[in-house]
From Swiss-Prot:
Residues 14-91 form the GIY-YIG domain. Residues 196-231 form the UVR domain. Keywords: Cytoplasm, DNA damage, DNA excision, DNA repair, Excision nuclease, SOS response. It holds the Pfam family UVR. This is UvrABC system protein C. GO terms for molecular function: DNA binding; excinuclease ABC activity. One of its GO terms (biological process) is nucleotide-excision repair. One of its GO terms (cellular component) is cytoplasm.
Length: 594
């Protein structure tokens, strides 16, 4: 331990606060909170720890701390510091883990949508639905039952939904505000838990249709009732008080924490959320950090009540989240907490079992591959693939597998710079040259095996650069595909000879994963570049659209198809002035221009 660390540890205060661990570059790598800073920070440098925590401690060369007046203030400060520094060892719930909502838009002719983006608009949002399939099934049922507008842009004539009885065709007919309000009120009633009432009304209509000999209509209503029954079956009543509550449970094992959240809505357990992450703190502190981040995410609406395990400071949770937080001692809520705890424990056990089994298989596959090729075990494998369509935007990609597993931080993308036109062999020469020239210059780790996605020509080009230009002698193999573009066999040696592997062997599956992954990485990069160029060229002739606005539109919509489907309002939401949004919409609506 550095001497200055010992000196700082000796004068730590016995007060609540936050601490920031730093590496040799001065980068904050971990942020924590403590009821007593002196005890918590010292604990990292004393006693025994698991390997994961030892890695963290091994990187710490300095720390700083901030004293707070209370545990609540420490929790709030910790969350803000994590957001500010994004430390690599902290829990960081990603913003992309959002749940879908069902939205009724506030348009003159409202629509029913699935969205993950909750906005402060006049629309009505229902959810979240942790199970996206459940959200889509519910919307599909509502679309059948209630004839709101379906099209994002008003067509010139009635569409199929009108003929199916699922739309009132406001595009060509007058649909009054009262008509829409009546439909919207029915949808709201259904989404607020009024399934039984809606079912009863449909049942009455079904019998009336049967009496009038309207058998098609009766069958349609019967199908709708069956769909409601299916939804209700998945949401059995478990609480009689109909209070919306989130029930939390957790388990900790081998330096990992699993938190399970049961979402109870209107007395029904509708779904659960499962999160697993490494933990470097006391379990209770890690849980509090998790729950703070969980509700900071805009997709998690706070219910009326939050139920937490007995080991958690419920008063702190209540003050921080400003909702009722309880620690049940008996009854149904306690049973649910214990069930959440049990599920969390089982999830961790399954995780470790699968990891252990997968690691054994993977390492064995790497060892077997080395034996089959007659080389040392290739613990580090690097693979290359080229991608171009009709000679446009030629690119190449390199991926790395370490101990048989993808090491995504090691992946590299290459735009082809020196080759004119679609020349796969010269492109391969260029990227191999660039990759290993840099590796030699910067002292980067070299692979035990290089895999080239291609045949003899690709292998010869890459080998020539590696050996004759760079003086490197690393085993290199070509990965040959069959006529269905599937992994067939390897070629290796000079001259290259085929190495046939058993198709059901672990080493063959490893090669398939490598080939699929390098192809995916290369083609994704190529499509990104190609998509950008297509969108940018398609927008070149629109007045008021320069490079800056092209980038904004590209980032917001991602594809020309989505832009063509967008409304004027959606272009405004993307940051376009209204007059520019109208110009873009008109331009893209004219199919002849594209």
């Amino acid at each position: 331990m550095h001497e200055h660390l010992k000196e700082k540890l000796a004068i730590l205060p016995d007060q609540p606060g936050c601490y920031l661990m730093k590496d040799k570059q001065g980068t904050v790598i971990y942020v924590g909170k403590a009821k007593v800073l002196k005890n918590r920070v010292r604990s990292y440098f004393t006693g025994s720890h698991d390997g994961k925590t030892l890695r963290l401690v091994g990187e710490i060369v300095d720390f700083e701390y901030i004293v707070t007046s209370s545990n609540l203030e420490a929790l709030i400060l910790e969350l803000n510091l994590i957001k500010k520094h994004d430390p690599k060892y902290n829990i960081q719930l990603k913003d992309d883990k959002t749940y879908p909502f069902i939205k009724i838009t506030a348009e003159k002719q409202p629509r029913l949508l699935i969205t993950r983006n909750v906005k402060k608009d006049k629309g009505k949002y229902f959810g979240p639905y942790p199970n996206a399939q459940s959200a889509h099934e519910t919307k599909k049922l509502l679309d059948r039952m209630y004839p709101l507008r379906k099209c994002s842009n008003m067509p010139d004539k009635v569409c199929l939904y009108y003929h199916m009885g699922q739309c009132l065709a406001p595009c060509v007919k007058e649909v009054t505000e009262e008509q829409n309000k009546e439909i919207v009120d029915e949808i709201i009633k259904f989404l607020n838990g009024g399934h039984k009432e809606v079912r009863s009304e449909l049942e009455t209509k079904m019998y009336e249709a049967s009496e009038k000999l309207e058998f098609e209509r009766a069958k349609e209503l019967r199908d709708q009732i069956a769909h409601i029954d299916a939804i209700m079956e998945k949401q059995k009543m478990i609480m009689s008080d109909l209070v919306d509550r989130d029930v939390f449970g957790y388990a900790v094992d081998k330096g990992w924490m699993c938190v399970q959240v049961f979402f109870v809505r209107k007395g029904k357990l509708i779904e659960r959320d499962v999160s697993m992450f490494p933990i470097y703190d006391e379990p209770e502190e890690g849980f509090l950090t998790f729950i703070g981040q969980f509700y900071e995410n805009s997709s998690h609406f706070k219910p009326k009540e939050i139920v937490v395990p007995g080991s958690i400071d419920s008063e702190l949770v209540e003050r921080f989240l400003e909702v009722e937080a309880t620690q049940p001692k008996r009854g149904k809520k306690k049973d649910l907490v214990e069930l959440a705890n049990k599920n969390a424990k089982i999830a961790l056990e399954e995780k470790f079992y699968l990891i252990e089994r997968d690691e054994e298989r993977t390492i064995k596959a790497v060892e077997n591959l080395g034996e089959q090729l007659g080389i040392e075990t290739p613990y580090r494998i690097e693979a290359f693939d080229n991608s171009n369509i009709q000679g446009t935007n030629p690119v190449s990609a390199m991926i790395a597998f370490i101990d048989g597993k993808p090491a995504k931080k090691e992946y590299r993308k290459y735009k082809i710079k020196t080759v004119q036109g679609p020349d796969d062999y010269e492109s391969m020469r260029e990227v191999v040259r660039r990759r290993y020239t840099r590796a030699l210059k910067e002292g980067l780790p070299l692979p035990d095996l290089i895999i080239i996605d291609g045949g003899k020509g690709h292998l010869a080009a890459a080998s020539d650069v590696l050996e004759n230009e760079l003086g490197l002698y690393i085993p290199m193999a070509g990965l040959v595909k069959d006529d269905k573009h599937k992994t067939s066999h390897l070629i290796i040696g000079d001259p290259p000879e085929p190495v046939m592997l058993e198709r059901n062997s672990q080493e063959f599956y490893l090669l398939q994963r490598i080939q699929d992954e390098v192809h995916r990485f290369a083609i994704t990069f190529h499509r990104q570049l190609h998509g950008k160029s297509v969108i940018q060229s398609a927008l070149d002739d629109i007045p008021g659209i320069g490079d800056k606005r092209k980038k904004i539109l590209l980032k917001h919509f991602g594809s020309l198809k989505k832009m063509k489907e967008a409304s004027v309002t959606e272009f405004v939401e993307a940051g376009m002035p209204k007059n520019v949004a109208e110009t873009i919409y008109s331009y893209l609506a004219d199919k002849k221009t594209l």
